[in-house]
């Protein structure tokens, strides 16, 4: 019996050592993926031109300002966010500021029914909104539609440096 307990103890210690090595490496890999995806999302939109709001658009029955980069409409258009995810994995979203809310207008984030989560709003009481309202980025864990993600949220600023939307990338934990 003592030999059996010793073997179990050695195996348990080995598992702890391996997990203490692997878990930080997984977290670092996720952080690197988030940074890489955000850089890709920003680069793809910058190539299109300066961000601006123009007119009104309907997103899942909500009227919101139209989000453009240069002459390219982003509202209800998924090419850019889908390209970022195809290249890097994870999820990507563009939010537009509509009053006090930030509304998903281009995303590959899916709701429980499998539909894109366009028209849903950023949690107005969550940790992200406080940083965005200060014009700052948020990097860290966030609950998105009830699921934990490692995320990066960066303000989208117009030519006058006003925050008009948010870039988002994230990876499920």
Write out the residue ranges for each language-model feature.
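N-terminal secretory signal peptides that target proteins for export/translocation
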Residues: 1-9
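Hydrophobic helical h-region of N-terminal Sec-dependent signal peptides
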Residues: 8-17
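Conserved beta-strands of PAS-like sensory domains
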Residues: 67-73, 148-173
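Extracytoplasmic/periplasmic sensor domains and loops in membrane signaling proteins
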Residues: 75-89, 106-146
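Short acidic/glycine-enriched loop/turn segments that link adjacent beta-strands
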Residues: 101, 145-149
């Amino acid at each position: 019996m003592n030999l059996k307990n010793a073997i179990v103890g050695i195996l348990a210690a080995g598992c702890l050592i391996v997990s203490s090595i692997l878990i930080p490496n997984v977290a670092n890999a996720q952080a690197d993926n988030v940074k890489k995806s955000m850089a890709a999302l920003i680069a793809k939109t910058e190539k299109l031109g300066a961000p601006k709001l123009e007119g009104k658009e309907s997103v899942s029955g909500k009227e919101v300002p139209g989000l453009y980069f240069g002459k390219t409409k982003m509202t209800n258009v998924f090419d850019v966010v889908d390209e970022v995810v195809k290249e890097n994995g994870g999820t990507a979203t563009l939010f537009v500021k509509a009053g006090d809310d930030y509304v998903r207008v281009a995303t590959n984030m899916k709701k429980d029914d499998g539909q894109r989560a366009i028209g849903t709003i950023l949690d107005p009481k969550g940790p992200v909104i406080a940083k965005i309202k200060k014009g700052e980025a948020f990097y860290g864990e966030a609950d998105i539609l009830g699921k934990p993600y490692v995320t990066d949220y960066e303000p989208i600023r117009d030519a006058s440096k006003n925050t008009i939307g948010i870039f988002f990338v994230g990876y499920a934990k």
